[in-house]
């Protein structure tokens, strides 16, 4: 029948399109019960048949495997007949609803028979033959896919259990992974009920004895996390799935789950309201004590929850919780008048900085004097940052190097640092070079090579040049020049420029540190000194196009422009330019 089922990366075959995941898991569980085990050919034929059967949905809603068996063609390849037969054998037969008894009075209709709810059945997990599941931690996309599948089903319902079983079979989760999955899928009430039921089942299993369980090695939850204890992990997973049997079977939380303790309500009266609501709302046979304990803590106000957390009684018996919160009383929340402290009066002595009375020295508006003379010019009246010798003389290059508009001195003095004694930040000078049509943008720079002194030269600022160009007279005599082709406005040129592959240092007037270039172009004819974009990019320069007002030309008479010999234009009445036109 083909080779046996191997162990691929994903041991679960993908469900056919249009079939719910929990229904597809039923077919997989039936296939894993075949002896000998199924092959890849059997799964391929099963998916192929289900794709055809979905187009005839007479066996769906509700699913009927007997009708599905009648749709299988005769002599169909694979073991589809055996898989469907196992499903028919393990699925309990649905009894027909009993007919309503006849009423004695013909005027009164007979009572409507209530349908009994089907008990959810959790079967043990069966893994593929020869393909044991490997543990994989949850990812957010996996949790979102599981939550989307069970969003329309209640916790503990058959669809919910089948989807969770498929997730457990695929990922082989540990005890911590199962706890995270429960917190992500269910509400706090359902998680609390499931936790209490799981603790009861674990205590019973530890008492009866489990194969491979050692009481001296810790609880079952700790031993199930051991990767070598695969049997204990499967037992814990089955107990975790069985704990859903005690949950309510409706999709939404009941009305008694929304009962909250008021901010000023005593804890005893809140528990009494919960007790009455559970007596009236719980169905018969549902244990009330675990639900009452869970709601007594989860729906209590913040003050009572803090008291229970501090004493470690979040899951204690109800009597201990009542004794812990019986002394709690709501706090007095009456409004009171807040009296602010009086402001410290100013000192009687004069300020040691300005000599005036009425303020502290930290609030003095006079700048803080320097501690000593300036280390540059030895002037004791200013700080080193304000020394005039450190400022660049911009009188000769006002058209080339412009300063940003700065604030007035009196405005800058008000912007002192907090508790800084009048310290003010120095002025920020940024290079702004205007590009105008009347005057070429030029800069006085200094160029130096390795082990050579800097040489002053006037360079043209060209934002269209990629590489800086230097004349051949500045090039060292022992330089190794390489031929190159330069594409300019006049076309390509091969004999005018050459490349100098050595470091070049360019000193700009507005930078203390020189700009270092790895290579530059050398003009053999000694005509051009161009500062290109490779140098401007290192100094973070920006283009500044100066705004120039447009020229206003006077209106000239015909005599001034030589048109006095032409006849005057004819006067033709036009609409709406004639005088008789309507102005409405």
Swiss-Prot record:
It comes from the Viruses. Residues 95-116 are annotated as: Disordered. InterPro entries: Aspartic_peptidase_AS (IPR001969), D_retro_matrix (IPR003139), Gag_p24_C (IPR045345), Peptidase_A2_cat (IPR001995), Peptidase_aspartic_dom_sf (IPR021109), Primate_lentivir_Gag_pol-like (IPR050195), Retropepsins (IPR018061), Retrov_capsid_C (IPR008916). A lipid is attached at residue 2 (N-myristoyl glycine). Its EC number is 3.4.23.-. The record marks 123-124, 337-338, 430-431, 553-554, 561-562 as: Cleavage. One of its GO terms (cellular component) is viral nucleocapsid. Interacts with human TSG101. This interaction is essential for budding and release of viral particles. Late-budding domains (L domains) are short sequence motifs essential for viral particle release. They can occur individually or in close proximity within structural proteins. They interacts with sorting cellular proteins of the multivesicular body (MVB) pathway. Most of these proteins are class E vacuolar protein sorting factors belonging to ESCRT-I, ESCRT-II or ESCRT-III complexes. This is Gag-Pro polyprotein.
């Amino acid at each position: 029948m083909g080779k046996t089922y191997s162990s691929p990366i994903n041991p679960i075959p993908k469900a056919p399109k249009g079939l719910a995941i929990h229904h597809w898991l039923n077919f997989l569980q039936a296939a894993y019960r075949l002896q000998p085990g199924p092959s890849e050919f059997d799964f391929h034929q099963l998916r192929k048949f289900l794709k055809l059967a979905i187009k005839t949905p007479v066996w769906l809603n509700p699913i009927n495997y007997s009708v599905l068996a009648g749709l299988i063609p005769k002599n169909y390849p694979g073991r589809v007949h055996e898989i469907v037969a196992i499903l028919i054998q393990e699925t309990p037969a649905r009894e027909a609803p009993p007919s309503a008894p006849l009423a004695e009075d013909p005027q009164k209709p007979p009572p409507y028979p209530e349908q009994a709810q089907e008990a959810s059945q959790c079967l043990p997990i069966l893994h593929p033959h020869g393909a044991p599941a490997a543990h994989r931690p949850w990812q957010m996309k996996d949790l979102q896919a599981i939550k989307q599948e069970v969003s329309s089903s209640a916790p503990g319902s058959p669809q919910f259990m089948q989807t969770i079983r498929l997730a457990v079979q695929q990922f082989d989760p540990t005890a911590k992974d199962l706890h995270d999955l429960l917190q992500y899928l269910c509400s706090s009430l359902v998680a609390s009920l499931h936790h209490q039921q799981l603790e009861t089942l674990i205590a019973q299993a530890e008492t009866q004895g489990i194969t491979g369980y050692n009481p001296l090695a810790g609880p079952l939850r700790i031993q199930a996390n051991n990767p070598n204890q695969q049997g204990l992990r499967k037992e814990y997973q089955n107990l975790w799935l069985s704990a859903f049997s005690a949950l309510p079977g409706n999709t939404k939380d009941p009305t008694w789950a929304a009962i909250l303790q008021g901010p000023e309500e005593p804890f005893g009266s809140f528990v009494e309201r919960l007790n009455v609501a559970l007596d009236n709302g719980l169905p018969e046979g549902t244990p009330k004590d675990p639900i009452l304990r869970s709601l007594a803590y989860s729906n209590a106000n913040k003050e009572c929850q803090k008291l229970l957390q501090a004493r470690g009684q979040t899951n204690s018996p109800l009597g201990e919780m009542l004794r812990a919160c019986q002394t709690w009383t709501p706090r007095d929340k009456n409004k009171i008048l807040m009296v602010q402290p009086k402001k410290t009066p100013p000192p009687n002595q004069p300020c040691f900085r300005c000599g005036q009375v009425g303020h502290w020295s930290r609030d003095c508006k006079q700048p803080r004097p320097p501690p000593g003379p300036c280390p540059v010019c030895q002037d004791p009246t200013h700080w080193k940052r304000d020394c005039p010798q450190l400022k660049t003389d911009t009188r000769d290059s006002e058209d080339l190097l412009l300063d940003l508009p700065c604030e007035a001195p009196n405005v800058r003095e008000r912007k002192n640092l907090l508790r800084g004694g009048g310290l003010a930040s120095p002025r920020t000078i940024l290079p702004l070079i205007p590009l105008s049509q009347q005057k070429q943008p030029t800069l006085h720079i200094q160029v130096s090579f390795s082990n050579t002194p800097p040489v002053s030269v006037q360079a043209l600022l060209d934002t269209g040049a990629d590489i800086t160009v230097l004349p051949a007279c500045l090039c060292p005599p022992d330089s190794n020049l390489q031929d190159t082709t330069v594409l300019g406005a006049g076309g390509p040129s091969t004999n005018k420029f050459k490349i100098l592959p050595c470091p070049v240092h360019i000193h700009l007037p507005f930078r203390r540190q020189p700009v270092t270039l790895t290579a530059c172009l050398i003009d053999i004819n000694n005509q051009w000194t161009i500062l290109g974009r490779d140098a401007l990019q290192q100094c973070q320069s920006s283009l500044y196009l100066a705004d120039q007002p447009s020229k206003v030309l006077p209106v000239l008479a015909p005599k001034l422009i030589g048109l006095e010999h032409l006849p005057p234009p004819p006067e033709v009445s036009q609409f709406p330019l004639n005088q008789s036109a309507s102005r409405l």
